A protein has these predicted regions:
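GHKL-type ATPase core
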Residues: 1-109
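GHKL/Histidine-kinase-like ATPase module
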Residues: 59, 66-68, 74-225
Length: 231
């Protein structure tokens, strides 16, 4: 950043820090604070010597904040864009997001009311390792989905980040849905003679699915961190 300021309210104190070109200016300032406020306020400006274009569109922030609200249930995130005016009020554009039940509410929002099934959600915790020579790590997993003949969507998140290219969560979803639906059709003798078994493409066409996981160790597919390889 070209410059950054940080104001932190915690444990009865107000802390303030100034930075310029990555270096602290003036040291840490600390003063007693008698209010009830807690949290952090960060102001910063991208450095145009580092970034070729610092005019980041509002749509980028909106999409990022919305996704963060989805995977952090009950958290309200607000966005005010002083460059864009609200045509109804003439004031700065303001938007907020909050999904009280996280990904389950998000799936319901995307799918709408006319769905083939209700939204199903589940959550689980586990401890495991990816290889025998690696240490154990904890993982918290949650998923929500429904079926619709009008909307199709698959999204995966890990440690609050959107996995644009999926990785192991996507592979797991493909395997699980195909296996379970195929088993059901076979057990109920619903396949016609000579009919091909179901593929994930058949499932995907009507599936609205979102998963969110958190782990204490993460293995990324590459440096873009848009896919994970955790087993």
């Amino acid at each position: 950043s070209a410059w950054m300021t940080a104001d932190i309210y915690r444990d009865g104190y107000h802390y303030h820090l100034d930075f310029k070109k990555g270096e602290n200016v003036g040291g840490l300032q600390k003063e007693a604070y008698k209010g009830r406020r807690t949290g952090s306020i960060i102001h910063w400006k991208p450095d145009d010597e580092v970034f070729t274009d610092i005019d980041v569109p509002g749509s980028y922030y909106k999409d990022t904040l919305r996704r963060q609200a989805v995977v952090n249930a009950g958290l309200t995130l607000n966005f005010t864009d002083e460059k864009e005016k609200d045509p109804a009020t003439g004031k700065a554009w303001h938007e907020s997001w909050c999904y009280e039940h996280g990904i389950a509410d998000y799936v319901a929002e995307v799918a709408g009311q006319d769905t083939l099934t209700p939204v199903f959600s589940c959550e689980s915790e586990a401890v495991g390792r990816d290889r025998e020579d690696q240490p154990d790590y904890k993982v918290l997993m949650s998923a929500a989905f429904c079926f619709s003949n009008k909307v199709q969507m698959l999204e995966y998140y890990h440690n609050s980040s959107w996995l644009e290219h999926g990785g192991s969560p996507e592979h797991a979803v493909r395997t699980a849905f195909v296996y379970q639906i195929n088993k059901y059709l076979k057990d109920k003798n619903l396949y016609k003679k000579g009919e091909s078994t179901i593929s994930f493409q058949d499932v995907q066409d009507c599936l609205v699915y979102v998963s969110s996981s958190f782990s204490t160790r993460t293995s990324y597919e590459n440096q873009t961190k848009k896919a994970i390889t955790n087993k």
